[in-house]
Amino acid sequence: MKQLLFTLIAALGMGANAASLSLNDVLSEVPALDPSIPIPEAVTGVKVGERHWYHHEIVRYLNTLADASPRMVPLGEHAKSYGGRVLISYAISSPENLARLDEFKAARAAIIDPNADLELSEQPAVLHMMYSVHGNEASGANATPLVAYYLAATTDENLLSQLENVIIILNPMLNPDGLDRFANWTNAHRGINPSNDPNDREHTEAIPNGRTNYYWFDLNRDWLPHQHPESRGRLALFHEWKPNVQLDFHEQGSNSNFFFMPGKPERTNPLTPDINQILTAKIGEYHAQAFDAEGIRFFTEEGYDDFFMGKGSTYPDLFGTVGILFEQPSSRGAVQDTVNGKLTFPISISNQFRASLSSIKATAALKDNLLAYQRNFYTERKRKRGYYLASAEGDPTRLQEFVRILRGHQIEVEALTSDVTAEGKTFKAGETIAIPLAQPQATYLETLWREQLEFEENVFYDVSTWTLPWAFNLSHTRDAVTNAKTEAMSSSVDDDESKLGKSAIGYLIDWRDSASPALLYDLLEAGANVRVATAPFTALTTNEGSINFGYGTLFVAPKLQESIPQPVLSLLAEAQTEGLAIYPAASSYTPEGIDLGSRAFDVLSLPKVLMVTGPGTSAYGTGEIWHLLDRRLDMPLTMVDSNRLSRVNLDDYTHVITTTPVRLEGVSKQLESFIKDGGILWAQGASTVAWAADAGLATATWRETAQQVRKDSLQTAIERGDEALSQAELLPARKPFATASDEYAFTLVRGSILQGNLDISHPLGFGYASEALAVFRTTNRFMNPSDNAYSSPVVYTDSPLLSGYMSTENQTLAANSAGLVVNQLGKGAVILSLDSTTFRAFWWGSQRLLVNGIFFGSLLEEPR
């Protein structure tokens, strides 16, 4: 039996590399193994580490293993990726524990119930082991066949004893689409003699790479917003099992050493209990022992942190769970030269295997401490009173998505039944949600609502803030109110309200509702005559009487001498059934404002959008836009690689979107002609805005830091030969070299929320109920407003920082700077957007800016 495991471990090597791994590289002592348990290559025909395994191979082997072993059962499909790949998890424990699995699962809810009578000593700890949320960090997922095999086949008494005290939830891959994308790449770019040169094509993936999911999102940043099916499934799994420890297996730069938690202490989230970090350190002692025994170097307490509460290793910290991050140096393929020597894929797998076993040992040894911590987290904290209130005037769809996110975190949400005035705002019953602070998940609710401006350290691994009501641009209370009256929320639609009324005049659609854009595209595609109101008005309707309508209201009317076609009426009826309010007009005459026959209703046409992708572009930025158009607007998008753009006839499109500069010969002239002929260019990001200005497509001027001003002044003095102005006066003061990194970090903007002032009469501002707009900022470049008084629809306020870190100098530069500028060029326009309006797919508050640019681009020409 020893030979079986030796063969398995040796199979981790390839060719000449096999000799670098022996049985003792993974296990110091090899127990007898159950011969009835199939080894990986017996099922898939592929040895672990021989090449990168695909999703279906891992699932096939683990399912076979579960059939063969009494220590392993499948928990079923908890999600399906956009690419159609199922995500399956498995429970691994002693046969006795698995026989009582439903009982132990039910007890998980009792552990966090202060009124439950549960003997903790009789409960096993739950360990959630998650691998490869980044698909091209593949050693984690590729380790799971080996981990599961050893747990199923071992006769080691110590490990069997550990399984009596631990239920393992094995989540073998969190990102199957990215995993397969990377497996396809690396397996297709290696021969029988793999290259260890870091410059080799195998080690430098094309864009998009395997890190991201189907729509090119980082799924490890999707725990908080859970916009994608993989995240929603794993979130449900997490709350179903309420683990005591959650493991998050990653890879990092090839020249690093292995990392495990704890992270940098100064960057721990202030809501994380101290005991959490103590337990993290205790668990770390078991990893240290395992890695020291093999002479494997590692590091802790630097580089990575526990601040952003939306990653796999930090999210659990606010639910009574201990989150642990592992970072293995990556071979990014079969083998790669590093400063530490030749790093092979098998070595990476063996370290993930080793960390898996040390985690099981630690969880079993600390079972009582972990269970007590989890119970105390929920039963001993001080309970707060009151409710947070939030509303989205005129946009129930946006509010419903906000509620969905909260409920995904098991946060209770209720409906306000009586109007409340608080913090200078009136919150109306029937339109406002109320979130009670007195609930089990109050801690995570607090981090979602929290606004933070003061920080112990100003260096961040990820973003510095994530205030959810600002992401949705909701009218909300910053503090809890105690005078709210509430009831359970209802999600049903009144049958009478779901029936489309008849009108010979036409139908009005409130553009404020986030469900309206998808309907608009369908209407235009169906050939409907759709117009948009460029001024507010009050109209008479057949179903609701007199109704006030704002900028951007859609008017679906019959064409001359025709009635509205039945396919168009069917689209309207279906939208009404799904909850979107459709108002049949009773008359073209309006009591106030423009009449329905006014020339202030502009005719809309079907947009045809091209987005620049591929070499040189950002997968994140383009993926966010692709997801918005494809999944939310339900409209097609043409994606063209940057190196092919010059060969595309842009006359076939109404819009070109780029999130990166396109510095290729002839492209600027091509785009200039496109814009002058009526096209719209959406240029997103500071470097893209600068490129558009440099290319002569737009005008943008920048605000300068004090250092930039000094540099410019020095250059001017040198050019003029001004001897009276000495360099000593203009050069920066001398500073210690060791402070350079921190000084640079202070200048960065790593995810802050700024308060913008929005012109809601501008076509890009149509559908907003308020001029206040919260924008997510990730760049430290600041743009001046346009010298055209009508062309800066978003300008930041004079004190714009709502939450997050931003240096004093950057705050000064941000004040009254522009977030969005429109440049007219011929019949078309260039829209300059410094910020991502669709950040991580959950910044619903600002995504409408891009949507408006797509549908209302023809309205951007300044009226004469």
Named regions from a protein language model:
Residues 199-217:
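Aromatic- and acidic-residue-enriched carbohydrate-binding clefts of CAZyme catalytic domains
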Residues 1-4:
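Positively charged n-region of N-terminal signal peptides that target proteins for export
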